[in-house]
């Protein structure tokens, strides 16, 4: 059967063992890690198989027959005999639930294999829903106890109805297997996988803790910088009343300058009227003096207007600077609150990590 073309009916992961063909007593593990074990339907031969691939070779390629029996020898270990392959397979699962699921699926596949055999004998064809036709589980074969109730093994019959000699040979092979040793080996490999996962999780936690500590230092430095900035801005805000007094004095100076400008404008206008109005016996020297006074007043007036505009500009800049300082203080305070909250979260995370570390 080509597993690349067929989809598995059911798949799980387990540590795979085979009975030692030389001693018929010890179990040989297929590897240090759990392998994928799947049920497949071979449509070409109209049979069901249990397949497990390790690397580039098939570790398990067992055809399920109606006479096979899957026996649970512990809470996490089960086994079955394959007379065609002349071996016994053992599976060590990570949990009792996985073992129960595999055993239930074994019963369903065995029933489907029985239906497939009956249909083949009747000349019919097995449809793709043969597995779903299994409505009842076939009771397991009687158990044979050789060393007490804790070491129950099963009696498996060949699909081709082997004789008493074959059955006795299988019974002897199974009875001589060290069930306790297999259970311990399965538990050992399961613990190895668990330890590897825990070690990886611990390394990730340590890396995360280091990263959190670095982030904590960065946050602390940034928070300290923000505290200094807030202190500077608060000092600037505290100095605002003094600046406010200066601004009031500036405003008064502006008002005085405006009054002086208006007065000078009036004087200029009066002088212009005098210079252009009808006069008796005008004197050239007096007229020139008057014109010079007018020019001086106009020059002074222009200077006053320029000073007024400069002072108004300074006043607006001072007001804008004050508003910017207030806004910057508000933003810095908000950012400081956020950083303090993040620091609190980092401390809580480090505390939880320290409690969880062994």
From Swiss-Prot:
Main localisation: cytoplasm
GO MF annotations in UniProt: G protein-coupled glutamate receptor binding; identical protein binding; protein domain specific binding
This protein's UniProt keywords: Coiled coil, Cytoplasm, Phosphoprotein, Synapse
Domain WH1: 1-113
Superkingdom: Eukaryota
Polar residues bias spans: 268-277
Subcellular location: Cytoplasm; Postsynaptic density; Synapse
Phosphoserine modification, residue list: 120, 158
Compositional bias per record (Basic and acidic residues), positions renumbered to this chain: 257-267, 280-290
Pfam family for this entry, one: WH1
SMART domains attached to this UniProt entry: WH1
Annotated spans, Disordered: 137-168, 239-296
InterPro entries, A to Z: Homer, Homer_EVH1, PH-like_dom_sf, WH1/EVH1_dom
Sections of the chain in a coiled coil: 95-122, 190-355
Job of this protein: Postsynaptic density scaffolding protein. Binds and cross-links cytoplasmic regions of GRM1, GRM5, ITPR1, DNM3, RYR1, RYR2, SHANK1 and SHANK3. By physically linking GRM1 and GRM5 with ER-associated ITPR1 receptors, it aids the coupling of surface receptors to intracellular calcium release. Negatively regulates T cell activation by inhibiting the calcineurin-NFAT pathway. Acts by competing with calcineurin/PPP3CA for NFAT protein binding, hence preventing NFAT activation by PPP3CA.
Subunit and partners: Tetramer. Encodes coiled-coil structures that mediate homo- and heteromultimerization. Interacts with NFATC2; interaction is calcium independent; interaction competes with PPP3CA for NFATC2 binding; interaction is reduced by AKT activation. Interacts with NFATC1 and NFATC4. Interacts with SHANK1; forms a high-order complex at least composed of SHANK1 and HOMER3; the complex formation is regulated by CAMK2A-mediated phosphorylation.
Family stated for the protein in its record: Belongs to the Homer family.
Domain notes: The WH1 domain interacts with the PPXXF motif in GRM1, GRM5, RYR1, RYR2, ITPR1, SHANK 1 and SHANK3.
Protein name as it appears in the record: Homer protein homolog 3
Species of the source: Rattus norvegicus (Rat)
Gene: Homer3
